[in-house]
Regions:
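Alpha-helix N-cap/helix-start and coil->helix boundary motif
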Residues: 6, 74-75, 93
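Short, well-ordered secondary-structure micro-motifs
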Residues: 10, 78-80
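Adenine-nucleotide phosphate-binding core of ATP-dependent small-molecule kinases
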Residues: 25-66, 76, 84-86
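GST superfamily/GST-like fold recognition
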Residues: 70-75, 100
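Conserved phosphate-binding/catalytic loops in two-lobed NTP-binding clefts
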Residues: 82-106
Length: 107
């Protein structure tokens, strides 16, 4: 279990004296050039590094690995993550809808 993106932004704001509350950005920068962009890029790149580290670790144990990235925040990371991934922000909703359709057709 790892803190999510919004929790990371909130923690930097809530537990420091003066860091602003930032949110996700799709702009890809190596380093921020202001406090706001540094907070944003720090959170975003930290998550990318964490995910890529997990993928690398699992890939060493299992040669064939498929990575599926879901959830509302997935859209912010698809272009940032270098490993081949499948991303669908609405995968859970689509799955639940298929279950609903399946159960409706059984009756």
């Amino acid at each position: 279990i790892s803190p999510g993106m919004n929790m990371r932004f909130r923690a930097l704001h809530d537990y420091t004296a003066r860091l602003p509350l930032e949110s996700a950005t799709d702009e890809i920068m190596t380093l921020g050039n202001t406090t706001s962009t540094a907070v944003g890029q720090g959170v975003m790149q930290g998550i990318v590094n964490e995910i890529e580290g997990y993928i690398e670790s699992f890939s060493k144990k299992n040669r064939e690995i498929s990575t599926i990235f879901t959830g509302g925040d997935a859209k912010h990371f698809v272009k940032r993550i270098k490993n081949a991934i499948f991303a669908d922000c609405e995968l859970v909703v689509c799955g639940l809808n298929r279950i609903l359709d399946y159960n409706a057709n059984k009756e």
